[in-house]
């Protein structure tokens, strides 16, 4: 009988926004099961390491600045060391962006990583939009099922789909305690909590005023429609707290929507991502534009409605690890802008998920 294969540490490169980094957690679970050790994750953005806090499929996380030359980045030396120390473990590159994929290839070359360890989602960098054929989670799982040239498939079989978990995020006990204390301070403790996420990466960015003035954000839904939706949600669940959530940069937008509702049951909060995850764990449902926080909510099993702009939910709809409902409103090919989606459509979708009882 052949001895069991030695456990290996997989390394995953993915230089993407929050939603993608949430969806990759199912692939991380596959790789952990397949190779016997949790993964090293290399991404971009200061928020990336905190996103994987408490995740048993992740051993370490490093994040580069997106536009700083990586040789000048503090993350470079520990990443180079981690790549060398994890040999002959596999390296999975989920990136295909025309700037980021060549950057990762340079990192691998300068770290001395054996090319036979590496498996790429795309051999060539991609510029501009791509016509997708499969959901991102499925594309990532297909990547994780591939075997690098330096290893043998028979020694590291791919776990069955039924054994996989995720996409999933985790909340720490200290974060639950902080959340519960905040809910008590606000007078929300013991009441149903419904989250609403009106913003996306454009509404929190430095050019947010310009996006709004020129009306060029395909994910923008007019203030009056958010107000009408919240009023109808309040009529359906009069005792619930309707909490408008965003980053601190989005608080003026949230307060504008709050004022337009004229409802005392509508609150606003600017949170960090970790605070958002804790709130999601306590929420009964959520309505979100197509954004990273929506993916986070689904990964924490929140019944969810996602309002789409130009993207297609066929390829980007958030997925839940528990089977909690996730419905889309709008998106290609039905519509190309969120403002083409009616309040009736979003409210009807929310009514469909709001009755789901979380375990």
Predicted segments — roles?
Residues 1-359:
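Catalytic machinery of carbohydrate-active enzymes
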């Amino acid at each position: 009988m052949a001895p069991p294969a030695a456990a290996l540490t997989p390394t995953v490169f993915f230089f993407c926004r929050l939603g993608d980094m949430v969806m990759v957690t199912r692939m991380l679970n596959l790789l952990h099961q397949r190779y016997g050790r949790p993964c090293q994750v290399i991404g971009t953005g200061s928020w990336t390491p905190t996103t994987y806090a408490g995740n048993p499929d992740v051993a370490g996380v490093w994040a580069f600045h997106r536009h700083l030359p990586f040789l000048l980045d503090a993350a470079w030396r520990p990443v180079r060391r981690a790549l060398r120390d994890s040999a002959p473990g596999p390296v999975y590159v989920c990136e295909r962006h025309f700037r980021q994929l060549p950057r990762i290839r340079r990192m691998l070359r300068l770290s001395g990583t054996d090319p036979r360890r590496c498996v790429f989602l795309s051999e060539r960098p991609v510029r501009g939009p791509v016509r997708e054929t499969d959901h991102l989670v499925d594309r990532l799982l297909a990547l994780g099922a591939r075997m690098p040239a330096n290893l043998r498939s028979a020694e590291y079989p791919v776990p069955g789909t039924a054994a996989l978990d995720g996409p999933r995020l985790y909340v720490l006990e200290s974060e639950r305690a902080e959340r519960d204390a905040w809910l008590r301070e606000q007078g929300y403790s013991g009441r149903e909590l419904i989250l609403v996420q009106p913003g996306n990466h454009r509404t929190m960015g430095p050019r947010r005023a310009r996006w709004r003035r020129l009306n060029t954000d395909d994910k923008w839904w007019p203030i009056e429609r958010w107000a009408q939706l919240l009023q109808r949600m309040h009529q359906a669940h009069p005792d619930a707290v309707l909490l408008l959530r965003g980053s601190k940069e989005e608080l003026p937008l949230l307060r504008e929507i709050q004022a337009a509702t004229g409802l005392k049951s509508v609150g606003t909060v600017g949170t960090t991502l970790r605070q958002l995850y804790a709130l999601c764990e306590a929420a009964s449902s959520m309505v979100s534009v197509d954004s990273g926080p929506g993916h986070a909510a689904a990964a924490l099993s929140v019944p969810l409605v996602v309002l789409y702009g130009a993207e297609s939910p066929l390829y980007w709809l958030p997925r839940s690890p528990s089977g909690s409902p996730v419905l889309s409103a709008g998106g290609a090919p039905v519509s190309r802008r969120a403002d083409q989606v009616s309040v009736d459509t979003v409210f009807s979708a929310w009514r469909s998920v709001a009755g789901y009882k979380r375990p």
